[in-house]
């Protein structure tokens, strides 16, 4: 996966699946393509998968979604032009405007998590999330309904951090070292030998995360809570 650093790359088709069958080539319709390297983020950690296109001089393939299964990135595709074959070279390009919107919402999720803990108590833990280009949803543990006053405080705090225009820091380290940095790790996830620590607005938000994030908090622009419900 090259998507942390690159929005496009030259790549090679390794596997093609159509109608549940492993095939050598595909000339029309829907299919799933696995590439040798990709800038497309595969859905995980609450963040939806990237979309975009795979192109060459004679080919155009629309990628509507990307799923991650183990270490494989499954590109959900529709053939727009030409025939695609295994071992063929293509240029993989994500929809950068959509990715940027998703990325902003993911970073806003981290800031909101910190604001929730600061205003409601350190017992608050993330239980799930949905991060898309249109919105974010954040599931968390709390013993009672969040009041209107608390919601306004959380919004103000998050927007203050956004407007501070601070750079995001990414640290790749061991899980043990990440805990010394104070990184939050929830969901009961199993972590490998190396983990990725995201520091947004200095030490305001420090979490383990494999998602994509803004380089500076000002890219989020603004934050507004539209609704709060219990589940």
PLM regions and their residue ranges:
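A glycine- and charged-residue-rich anion-binding loop/surface
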Residues: 1-231
């Amino acid at each position: 996966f090259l998507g942390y650093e690159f929005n496009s790359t030259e790549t090679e088709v390794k596997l093609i699946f159509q109608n549940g069958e492993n095939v050598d080539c595909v000339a029309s319709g829907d299919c799933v393509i696995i590439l040798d390297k990709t800038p497309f983020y595969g859905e995980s950690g609450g963040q939806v998968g990237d979309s975009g296109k795979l192109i060459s001089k004679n080919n155009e393939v629309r990628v509507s979604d990307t799923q991650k299964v183990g270490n494989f990135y499954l590109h959900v595709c529709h053939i727009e032009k030409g025939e695609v074959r295994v071992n063929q070279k293509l240029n993989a390009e994500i929809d950068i405007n959509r990715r940027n919107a998703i990325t902003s919402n993911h970073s806003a999720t981290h800031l909101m998590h910190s604001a929730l803990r600061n205003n409601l108590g350190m017992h608050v833990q993330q239980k799930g999330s949905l991060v898309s280009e249109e919105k974010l949803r954040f599931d968390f543990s709390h013993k009672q309904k969040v009041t209107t006053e608390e919601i306004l405080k959380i919004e103000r705090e998050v927007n203050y951090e956004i407007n501070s225009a601070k750079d995001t820091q990414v640290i790749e380290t061991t899980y043990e070292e990440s805990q010394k940095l104070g990184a939050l790790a929830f969901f009961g996830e199993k972590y490998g030998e190396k983990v990725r620590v995201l520091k947004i607005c200095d030490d305001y938000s420090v979490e383990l995360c494999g998602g994509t994030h803004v380089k500076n908090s000002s890219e989020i622009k603004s934050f507004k809570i539209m609704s709060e419900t219990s589940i």
